[in-house]
Amino acid sequence: MYLLIVFLPLLGSSVAGFFGRFLGSEGSAIMTTTCVSFSSILSLIAFYEVALGASACYLRIAPWISSEMFDASWGFLFDSLTVVMLIVVTFISSLVHLYSISYMSEDPHSPRFMCYLSIFTFFMLMLVTGDNFLQLFLGWEGVGLASYLLIHFWFTRLQADKAAIKAMLVNRVGDFGLALGILGCFTLFQTVDFSTIFACASVPRNSWIFCNMRLNAISLICILLFIGAVGKSAQIGLHTWLPDAMEGPTPVSALIHAATMVTAGVFMIARCSPLFEYSPTALIVITFAGAMTSFLAATTGILQNDLKRVIAYSTCSQLGYMIFACGISNYSVSVFHLMNHAFFKALLFLSAGSVIHAMSDEQDMRKMGGLASSFPLTYAMMLIGSLSLIGFPFLTGFYSKDVILELAYTKYTISGNFAFWLGSISVLFTSYYSFRLLFLTFLVPTNSFGRDISRCHDAPIPMAIPSILLALGSLFVGYLAKDMMIGLGWNFWANSLLVLPKNEILAESEFAAPTIIKLIPILFSTLGAFVAYNVNLVADQFQRAFQTSTFCNRLYSFFNKRWFFDQVLNDFLVRSFLRFGYEVSFEALDKGAIEILGPYGISYTFRRLAERISQLQSGFVYHYAFAMLLGLTLFVTFFCMWDSLSSWVDNRLSFILIVSSFYTKSSQE
């Protein structure tokens, strides 16, 4: 049963990929959706056995790589953390597959699309079930490849090509850090197996000298692993690929942002909690990075006009919450928020897809408006998703997002307070852009043509069913799972997560946090909704004043252009590397020094040497006798004096002297 959970999506992908032309669009869609749905049902059974029954399962399949001290096997680990991720991945993926049947029905390449979706799901399942770093890395690279294929699905679009290449290249930076971290683990522990590494993590280790600095070995490994999470989970610095990934079909965006790809970094940190717990330095870095990401993405999303990009930046901001929750050693709350976020984020994307599908692929919110009457079901679904996103009381997002902020406050450290206040301010901006999206899309007077609005229709049944199921999850999952996953006195996570006693603050945040601290997120959410209502629905004078102010125009450009991150990266990093590659690597080295010292220089040297030797053939015997006498004299001299000369004369210097003499003579000529 456990193996079927992982390999059923691979089976569906293989059938759709190899036999899609025979099955057709409908047959491929039914095959892949059925396989992923069965995998989802089996995941529920595994959740009951492993998490609720406290019976972790380990499967060793076969040896993979065995070379001296290096031993990696195909193995699968099913513990509480794994089965929670299995439910998230398979349930969201099955709903996205069902949604795609109708959404992609008119696309001639639908079998290829369904094949890519299933292979994406398979690689994510490989990532979360692997029992060693090598298998995790295989799934890690697999989801990167699948995301490239899905973003690049409409390959005739130039922007889709650029977005796919950007996602691949930016993620390569993080993947390089992850690979170095895995190599560091093997160097330190002589294995890549999770159980062995985590068992030895508490043993004191010597420091390493890295870049002339003495670093703690565990801290260096954890920071390198975190660099991998920065790339995959779109943290500050490597986050620029995530909004551009919206160029793919909307079901792809839902799957990437809700269940796969971006959640891989959070899962990896939670899986490696026994390592990170012994590196306070790495935890501080993670906390600061996550807090800055949540603030950066929230401020960027307030002035975006693309419907899907606004939701994409909300994903980036929520990932910041998950990351800094890991940084304050509350991995269970981070994974709980990951699960809750999957429901309402998939709901938001699928609802946005219904609007875009009906509006003939129009994504600019400024060209919409007045759609609430034409899309009553979609409007209700989008409203539920947005309220859950901002942490409206008693919805799913409320039970995890507010807990993260309370935990950050009760950490009572500089990093904790930094994360709390940036996270709280991010709640304000999150509420603003969530309600701005609702107002501009559904409630303001329409900015579209009347004939376009009259042709619009609400989501068909195959697209509505996944949205309704996700809406139910966005309403009730947080309430139902809170006590089980983060409640006091429940050993739900068992040994899958490790928190040292000195870092355990969950009980303190529950009982010691001041009431005003618990109310701040709700107050900020209300304030953000109030500002969004007045700015986008009521205050026309404010909008005119904003448009005519020079400072406001510059502020608008700053946030709308995403803090100029793309421009800075292009101007100072990408362009510098391109210039170095052409002027230094290509011109100066490849076509310059290397070619002169390499093939061209050697051929020229021997040609000039042959010409010089040929000039010695004068035809006079006494010239030849003199040359032989001179050569014999030099040979005897060097032979007799070799012991004294060899200590300060290198043979290579003699060769360079001979070659340079030819170049000197040729230049004089």
UniProtKB/Swiss-Prot annotation:
Lineage summary: Eukaryota, Viridiplantae, Streptophyta, Embryophyta, Tracheophyta
GO molecular function, one term: NADH dehydrogenase (ubiquinone) activity
InterPro entries: NADH_DH_su5_C, NADHpl_OxRdtase_5_subgr, ND/Mrp_TM, NU5C-like, Proton_antipo_N
Compartments it resides in: Mitochondrion inner membrane
GO cellular component: mitochondrial inner membrane; plastid; respiratory chain complex I
Name the UniProt record assigns to this protein: NADH-ubiquinone oxidoreductase chain 5
NCBIfam families: NDH_I_L, PRK06590.1
Keyword tRNA-binding: no
